Regions:
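P-loop NTP-binding core
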Residues: 1-265
Length: 265
């Protein structure tokens, strides 16, 4: 199955929320999903009901097979938190990730697994993890807001460069405009610009929706909180488009066809 990297040059765009609910969308459809948190903030676990006191994570397991450490959080859904860490542990972790073909060699049982869809969450901007995973990442999802700060990044994306050129690996990058509000003129203008300029690289838009915030506060998916919400519908549409782009079908609980991965092996 494919590896999807969710990354953004800008923080505060709702990236981790997108990761969590996208994972829920795929698992609800029958796909076996593993979510991996590469962000030292270690916040993704909170979207899946893990305790603040739970210190488990991949940061202390750089040379061990992560698939045996996956935590079951829902039907068809597993996660690997980043874990509690200090500066020295993060330095050792980054050094391990620098190994040639780290994800193909050390972590191949997870990242080259035909029965698992991997969705990886990253800290904003360039990171060693984002650099290292480029060799196995099939698609990069880049959440941005429909605001002035994000507009300043559009020209870099359109020219093919951002985050040290990492955007563009595999099948390339796809933009998600998050928290859109059509009552705001700038929001509407940014949407129109994105539609005209990114075209097929605009994966979709997610409406600003209090249901998302409330669901996160209760550590559940937006589908469990309100499956009829605008954001739930938007994320479902995006998930289906991702599956179409990557060329896989969801069938009764597992899997699928990923010709791109086979070509890369």
């Amino acid at each position: 199955m494919p590896v999807i990297s969710v990354c953004s040059p800008k923080g505060g765009v709702g990236k981790t929320t997108v990761v969590a609910n996208l994972a829920y969308a795929f698992s609800r459809s029958g796909s076996k999903v593993v979510v991996v948190d590469f962000d030292p903030q270690n916040a993704l676990r909170l979207y899946f009901g893990l305790s603040l006191n739970d210190e488990r994570g991949i940061v202390t397991l750089p040379n061990k097979d992560w698939i045996s450490s996956c935590i079951s959080v829902d039907k068809n859904l597993y996660m690997l938190p980043f874990g509690k860490s200090d500066k020295e542990q993060r330095a050792v972790f980054d050094e391990a990730l620098k190994q040639d073909n780290y994800f193909k060699n050390v972590q191949s049982s997870l990242f080259d697994n035909p029965d698992v869809l991997v969705i990886a969450d990253f800290a904003p901007g360039y990171t060693q993890a984002l650099d290292s995973i480029a060799s196995v990442s099939n698609l990069q999802v880049v959440p941005l807001l429909a605001d002035a700060a994000s507009v300043s990044l559009f020209s870099q994306l359109l020219s093919g460069g951002l985050m040290d050129g990492l955007v563009g690996g595999g099948l390339g990058y796809y933009i998600v405009l998050n928290q859109i509000d059509n009552r705001i003129k700038l929001n509407r203008e940014v949407q129109n610009f994105a539609l005209q300029n990114f075209k097929d690289n605009l994966l979709g838009m997610i409406h600003k929706d209090t249901n998302v915030t409330e669901a996160a506060g209760q550590q559940i998916s937006v589908y469990d909180y309100n499956k009829n919400s605008a954001a739930a519908f938007d994320i479902e549409v995006i998930a289906k488009k991702v599956a179409q782009i990557l060329g896989f079908d969801v069938k009764k609980g597992t899997k699928v066809i990923n010709p791109l991965r086979r070509q890369n092996v």
